[in-house]
Amino acid sequence: MSRPGFVLEVDERTPALLVNEGEGFRLERFPLGTRVIYPPDSLPGIRDIDTAIRRALLDPHEEEPLTALLRPGMRLTIVFDDISLPLPQMRTPDVRQRIIEQVLELAAAAGVDDVELLAANSLHRRMTPAELKRTVGDRVYRSFFPHHLRNHDAEDPEGLVELGTTRHGEVVEINRRAAESDLIVYVNITLTAMNGGSKSVAVGLGSYRSLQHHHNVHTLQHSRSFNDPRQSAMHHSYDRMAEVLGEHVRIFTVETTLNGESYPPHVQFMNKREWEWSLADQASYLALRKVNSASPASVRRQVWQRTYSPYGITGVHAGAPAAVHPHTLANVHRQQLTEVDGQSDIGVWGLPFICPYNVNSIMNPILVMSLGLGYFFNLYRNRPIVRRGGVGIFYHPMPDTFHPVHHASYIDFYETVLTRTTDPQLIEKKYEEKFATDPWYRHLYRTSYAYHGVHPLYMWYWGAHALDHLGDVIFVGADRGTAARLGFRAASTLADALEMARETVGSSPTITYHHSPPLALADVR
């Protein structure tokens, strides 16, 4: 049985602790009394994944077996999560490939000829042919690409259809092919409690008209947290949209969960608690840190982006989305949930090299903000690990670097908007429509590999709850000019950051270090 998560209190015997800082990492000594949140040990993966998939398809939750839903002459659309999941990317064969292959085998046996596959990329950049092939596998790729395996296009006026509005007046507009299908099979990887469930189709196949109802400042400030659906206004909106979807299209969802094997064997020390490092782990740390530090940034980036994780699959559940998702969340909680007693004055997070929007790309400063104040700050249930008015300290070098193809509108947002204001509400009011409707950004989204024009604004809104909650934000090791552009302060060391934080929280602050990844979901009591 795997050990549960726990909270360590730093004392004289505690070794230096591993902290991520983008495409680098360090060992850091924390002040005595600092609380350190560790996730549960990695759960064992399912040994026979193919059998687990087949069992899920044939014995689903509150739905007929998939074989009973397939018939000749029907329109079947298989939808799958894009490259924003999982993080880091998983080793091949991808579990999505395994599921899709079995669904296609059952469809062929049932005489289903009209089959299309869609990547649920929402307002994300399109997946490249190579990325699609890596996700679905060579056999599926060769059989369906390019005419029947493609990316969702959230800006195709002919390819979208409005299904109705929710009781709150939210427009539900999704991909036409999916909406007009007899059955959607959605293939999901749930990395955190934020993923899956009602979100999958409503967001993955949605348009800007739909997404603006939940990807806005007010909703995100009242999503406390993204990983606590009960208290997330964003998830409440997803659920309302799912009700409308359920009136128009039948959805058979297949959700999978992963264990905590976030890093491969050559960096296995990153999966372990520091006092349990072997001599080999210590040697690996020293060697990798030396090589990593000596390498140019572009080389480090390429190496880390090709670091594929040997995840084990901890669950495969299929059927009606509302019936499946509770089982999925239970598996996520088994792997990630750690009880924490109360809040601290200061929260500390080390940010890794990866986020949902820099896969095979570059972590630009706006994505650093989104990763830290959005994704990592929101890795809690009930309450944040840091009190209201407290200080958030994040580790990341925050280089002033952008991918010119993927993040075209990010560059303009950074240069023309953040130089004027960092206020999410003002940005939303004054700039969102311009970025969302700009014809050049729309062209790049549809024909190149750029994120939608509005995407950098949404990533800024992603940190709105943290900006409202925290009294100060400090980045350790960050480029000072870049941090200042974003409205944050920079410190050279943790000691400097703590000294700066005392201006806000006093001379004897309590400190909590959220040690992730592997991901820990803090259940703050």
Spans of model-derived segments:
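Extended hydrophobic packing segments that form well-structured cores
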Residues: 2-40, 45, 57-58, 461-525
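Glycine-rich phosphate/diphosphate-binding loops that line cofactor/substrate pockets in enzymes
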Residues: 61-82, 109-112, 338-345, 386-387, ...
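Short glycine-rich or small-residue beta-strand-to-loop segments that form or flank ligand, phosphate
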Residues: 75-90, 116-123, 186, 348
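Histidine-anchored nucleotide/phosphate-binding helix
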Residues: 87-111, 206, 375-385, 393
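Well-ordered mid-protein domain cores that form the structural environment of catalytic cofactors
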Residues: 93-171
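Short internal beta-strands
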Residues: 111-124, 254, 393-396, 472-477
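Conserved, well-structured core segments that form the ligand-binding/active-site neighborhood
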Residues: 142-343, 374-378
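C-terminal catalytic subdomain
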Residues: 360-472
